[in-house]
Amino acid sequence: MIAEQHQAVVDSGASKKGAKVGFVSLGCPKNLVDSERILTQLRTEGYDVTNSYDDAELVIVNTCGFIDSAVQESLDTIGEALAANGKVLVTGCLGVKKDEIIELHPNVLGVTGPHAYDEVLAQVHEHVAKPEHNPFIDLVPPQGVKLTPKHYAYLKISEGCNHRCTFCIIPSMRGDLDSRPVGDVLGEAKRLVDSGVKELLVISQDTSAYGVDVKHKTDFWDGMPVKTHMQQLCEELAKQGVWIRLHYVYPYPHVDKIIPLMAEGKILPYLDIPFQHANKRILKLMKRPGSSDRVLERIAKWREICPELVIRSTFIVGFPGETEEEFEELLNFLEEAQLDRVGCFKYSPVEGATANALPDHVSDEVMEDRLQRFMAVQAKISSDKLQVRIGQEYLILVDEVNGLGIVGRSYMDAPEVDGKVYLSDDYDAKPGDQIWVQIIHADEHDVWGVRVED
């Protein structure tokens, strides 16, 4: 999965009495969850988190290292934090390249890899003494510190990945699949819902593989046995009564069993499946599962069972050796699959990826041309599919209310990566509200609507 790059210098909302730690979180939602866990532990120990380098006694930078632009952003951010503060701890995916970080930034206080929560806290203790605080007064909310808006949250169900995609280095950074106990996942989900969360976004490196590493062993939740398996997890999450959105789903056969849950309204009819390509030879070079014919058959079957199903995917153009004919096969796949939401990236030779050694690399000029052609085809598909939504009514979750009106999302839209629903400012609403909207206009990405009575 291509990581979404974003930076957040955060303020946990803590009191202003304790020792202050600055924090910068870079990268994808999985990294954001790591940041939330570190921040929660800091707050539990009485540290304050500040959004100013100047006020902090040290700064933690949680890095991304998936693609070259992410590496550069991480290195630049470390440099900025050093220049502004002077005391910096580095963690996250880029932390596995400790020598590279120290060579460029020798003054960092310490470097750790991803999900190294205890090591990060130990390094903080080494440089900033634990503040005196009363844990019964300075309470951390049961759901922990969250960096997302209060009405939605990411629910990470596992770490690592057992795949060895040739364009990816995630397993070398985050290790093999390590599924969280299903009871722990469901407990976190309940705490989040109890705190007011209206949407849970299930994330991992490979959501479909949840529980494979522990042979789908039985755990317990609320006194009842539950298998560590994607299907059983979805069935239990559905009982929370909030939107459940699935991300990073590989098209394994058992995904077919999730579609009826969507058709029954138990979880959102939304699947994020990173197909990456359609040509059989390219998929084999990528070490990716699937073939276009089989995928198209399954998509048709899914839509027959659940007509409202929305499918998001990501693709790579310009993979080493990709011919014009193979790229055109990808375009034909787009036309046949009629996917709802699509992202596309030019192949990036990530340091350490085995695909870099493949012959016949595609020039950047050709990659850019293919990217533009790909996006033009998908823009037309997306526009046509959204035009069909005009006149229909949807429940939306309000994300923002500003001077121009209300900004929300329907079940078709995940935060940050998909489209939005815009309404005029004639309605009384606040973030986290759920309201019914009739769509009156659409382009290739977003829709506009008017409120209707519940």
From Swiss-Prot:
Task: Tell me the name of the encoding gene.
Answer: rimO
Enumerate the spans annotated as MTTase N-terminal domain.
Answer: 19-129
Q: What is this protein called?
A: Ribosomal protein uS12 methylthiotransferase RimO
Residues annotated for [4Fe-4S] cluster 1 binding in this entry: 28, 64, 93
Keyword field contains Nucleotidyltransferase: no
As for what it does, the entry says:
Catalyzes the methylthiolation of an aspartic acid residue of ribosomal protein uS12.
| Primary localization | cytoplasm
Q: Which GO terms describe its cellular component?
A: cytosol
Keyword set includes Metal-binding? yes
For this UniProt record, the keywords arranged alphabetically read as follows: 4Fe-4S, Cytoplasm, Iron, Iron-sulfur, Metal-binding, S-adenosyl-L-methionine, Transferase
Domain named Radical SAM core: which ranges?
147-384
